[in-house]
């Protein structure tokens, strides 16, 4: 799979970012199966962003729990979110606190 080595994760249009964007390393996560994060990917089609239609399109933090929220794609307790996965790993090297991923704005 051809993925960018490094990228910056930002909220999609319509969502308010309250913290700094996240520098993300695909290379640093290469040992994981791509579907760990891209859980709707079939292994063949182009990989879509989390905010793509059919995924986490709701940019609000409130509302029906059945609607996948963009925020929850990264912050839920589920092991298919960034925070949930890192907490489940319980590794000292993995970020689990807000400031670990979201550096203070300068």
From Swiss-Prot:
Binding site for heme c 4: 75, 98, 101-102
UniProt organism field: Maridesulfovibrio salexigens
InterPro entries named among the record's database cross-references: Cyt_c_III, Cyt_c_III_dom, Multihaem_cyt_sf
Residues holding heme c 2: 39, 50, 55-56
Function: Participates in sulfate respiration coupled with phosphorylation by transferring electrons from the enzyme dehydrogenase to ferredoxin.
Listed name of the protein: Cytochrome c3
Pfam families for the chain: Cytochrom_CIII
Binding site for heme c 3: 29, 82, 85-86
UniProt keyword terms in alphabetical order: Electron transport, Heme, Iron, Metal-binding, Sulfate respiration, Transport
GO biological process, alphabetically ordered: anaerobic respiration
GO molecular function, one term: metal ion binding
Misc: The second heme binding site has an unusual CXXXXCH motif.
Binding positions (heme c 1): 26, 34, 37-38
Modification after translation, per record: Binds 4 heme c groups per subunit.
Domain of life: Bacteria
């Amino acid at each position: 799979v051809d993925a960018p080595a490094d990228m910056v994760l930002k909220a999609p249009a319509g969502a308010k970012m309250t913290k700094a964007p996240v520098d993300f390393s695909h290379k640093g996560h290469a040992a994981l199966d791509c579907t760990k994060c891209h859980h709707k990917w079939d292994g063949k089609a182009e990989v879509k962003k989390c905010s793509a239609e059919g995924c986490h399109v709701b940019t609000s933090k409130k509302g029906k729990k059945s609607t996948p929220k963009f925020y929850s794609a990264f912050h839920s307790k589920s092991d298919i979110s960034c925070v949930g996965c890192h907490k489940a790993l319980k590794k000292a090297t993995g970020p689990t606190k807000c400031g670990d991923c979201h550096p203070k704005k300068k």
